[in-house]
UniProtKB/Swiss-Prot annotation:
It is found in: Cytoplasm, Nucleoid. The keyword Cytoplasm applies. The keyword Aminoacyl-tRNA synthetase does not apply. It comes from Lactobacillus gasseri (strain ATCC 33323 / DSM 20243 / BCRC 14619 / CIP 102991 / JCM 1131 / KCTC 3163 / NCIMB 11718 / NCTC 13722 / AM63). This is Replication initiation control protein YabA.
Length: 114
């Protein structure tokens, strides 16, 4: 192969490599752009999760306060069940309907935490 042909082929190879490098550069810019967008989206989602968690905590506290109120009413000798709500219980008498409500209230709260 003569030197002119070699130079011509080398020039063609160089042009092909230049196109390949330009393509890789464009691909890299797209990946970097997507990466930046995903980082921003990730940060926004983390902030939303933090807000949701912050809103969830007071609901759990309200739930515990509600359970405590029901327990106090029941321990004071009054029914909290639908059938006898507000009526006085005899001393030492347990109501299975009231106890069922308290038990479900406690179990429901534990499921939400798990």
């Amino acid at each position: 192969m003569d030197p002119f042909s070699q130079l011509s082929q080398l020039q063609q190879n160089l042009q092909a490599m230049t196109k390949t490098v330009a393509g890789l550069e464009n691909d890299m810019l797209e990946v970097l752009k997507e990466n930046t967008e995903l980082k921003v989206e990730n940060q926004l989602l983390r902030e939303k999760i933090s807000k949701l968690d912050a809103n969830k905590e007071p609901a759990e506290n309200k739930s515990q306060a509600g359970l405590k109120s029901l327990r106090n009413i029941y321990d004071s000798g009054y029914h909290i069940c639908n059938m006898y709500y507000g009526s006085h219980r005899e001393s030492g008498e347990d109501c299975m309907f009231c106890l069922d409500i308290l038990d479900n209230f406690v179990n429901h709260g534990q499921k939400n935490r798990g």
